[in-house]
């Protein structure tokens, strides 16, 4: 598999269900993963049309941090322009 990807290439890898990270990140064991809207709705017990005003979920990219927490992730300009993205093996 190709390593040292651009952010655009890393996004495509996320869409395929794999996890990615930047070799330039300081924290150990940090990586991104994509959770689909269908999976999120199912996790929260929605998506079946059972409730009035049932929320609609969108796809979300999450980060697993060095201190073992999961957060929604928003890229910095540095992340977007980086060419050091890699696939978690």
Swiss-Prot record:
3'cADPR binds at residues 25-26, 73, 79. Mg(2+) binds at residue 42. Signal peptide: none annotated. The keyword Nucleotidyltransferase does not apply. Keywords: Metal-binding. It comes from the Viruses. InterPro entries: Tad2-like_dom. One of its GO terms (molecular function) is metal ion binding. Counteracts the host Thoeris antiviral defense system. Probably acts by binding and sequestering cyclic ADP-D-ribose signal molecules produced upon viral infection (3'cADPR or 2'cADPR); sequestration prevents the signal from activating the ThsA of the Thoeris antiviral defense system. Homotetramer. This is Thoeris anti-defense 2. It comes from Bacillus phage SP01. The lineage of its organism: Viruses, Duplodnaviria, Heunggongvirae, Uroviricota, Caudoviricetes.
